[in-house]
């Protein structure tokens, strides 16, 4: 039981399940499909496979890594009059979003990873080197989130975009995805990002911590407590459905 907001033993609900018990099954298997990095959707081969997936299954949402990675080229800096200035380029993002829209998919936005020029460190993950360190400037990060959402609403309409769930980062409880798996630093990122999103439109649904196995119970408990103590009305809580135990490793392959 997750103790959120001072829940007590009296708040527990006892459920008895017998072999004859029946209940409605909320089948969410087609709610969202995971993909690799978002930049893959820029290729024709990927889009062909996506059309096939939608024809055969028909998912509602799609979630992928690397929205803010350098291959998407959103975060750009240049020097003018002796000052470093920031601008945002959405050319590739628009192509990806358009590809999703053509096959009837809505994005499940995962905000990450860190643009190299905004990163506080050099740690990366995967061959495409997604930076997994906190922002060196949280104000610049929040400005980037602001700009992203405003652009999406301008292009696809406010009523459409607020139906896209937003998740802050990916699996911060794993050192590879978040430097040192620093829980408090992630909570800071979530808090600042949550506020930034709601400033654009309070109708956006924002969630986390998007954890994966192992320490998930500890993280979710702490996350809920942090949200309660800091008056963050989180819209949903996510945990990725992998094994609880560490995977068995044979050579460089891991099996769950």
Regions found by a protein language model. Give the residues of each.
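Short intrinsically disordered, low-complexity coil segments enriched in acidic
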Residues: 1-4, 252-256
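Substrate-binding cleft and catalytic face of glycoside hydrolase catalytic domains
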Residues: 57-255
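Mature N-terminal, pre-catalytic/accessory segment of carbohydrate-active enzymes
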Residues: 1-60, 64-65
